[in-house]
């Protein structure tokens, strides 16, 4: 059995924007049918207890980035560094959580996931996506036209 820890950041934006807890709960709901996978959601920016890491296969963080990044609080970076570097714990960051200020946190994240969003260099435009036609492909089966507001990141620093 694999154990995935989903860490949702503290509320920080208006309703409907950067809904960290709701996003992680939705992701957990989608993953609960995966055979051999246990998913635990932790909110308020970190694990409910350090014991949660016991037996964990991977950690994913969906939270504010920059100076409010959960990895920069308390001993969080050191705790995960030991597990990622020495035990091979899987690690992922979602959306705003890929932004870290320059320093040890950014260097470690670069080593773990290959890069990070760098303030004043990377970009994150917001656009209205309107998808009217989808290709005939198995991955698009059952998907109909839709519109959404999308914020995407590019020029990530590797």
Where are these regions (language model features)?
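Extreme N-terminal starter segment of soluble prokaryotic enzymes
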Residues: 1-3
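Helical hinge/lid and interdomain linker segments adjacent to catalytic or ligand-binding clefts
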Residues: 5-7, 12-101
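Secondary-structure boundary/capping signal
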Residues: 35-39, 117, 147
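C-terminal and late-domain segments of enzyme folds
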Residues: 42, 138-158
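A glycine-rich, often tryptophan-bearing local segment used as a flexible ligand/cofactor-contacting loop or short
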Residues: 66-145
């Amino acid at each position: 059995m694999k154990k995935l820890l989903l860490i949702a950041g503290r509320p920080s934006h208006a309703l409907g924007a950067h809904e960290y807890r709701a996003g992680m709960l939705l992701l957990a709901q989608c993953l609960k049918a995966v055979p051999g996978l246990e998913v635990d959601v932790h909110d308020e920016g970190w694990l409910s207890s350090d014991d949660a890491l016991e037996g964990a296969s991977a950690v994913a963080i969906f939270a504010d980035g920059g100076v409010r990044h959960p990895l920069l609080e308390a001993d969080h970076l050191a705790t995960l560094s030991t597990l990622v570097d020495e035990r091979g714990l899987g690690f992922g960051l979602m959306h705003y959580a890929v932004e870290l200020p320059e320093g040890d946190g950014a260097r470690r994240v670069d080593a773990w996931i290959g890069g990070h969003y760098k303030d004043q260099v990377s970009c994150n435009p917001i656009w209205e996506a309107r998808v009217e036609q989808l290709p005939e492909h198995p991955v698009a089966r059952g998907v109909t036209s839709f519109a959404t507001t999308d914020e995407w990141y590019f020029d990530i620093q590797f």
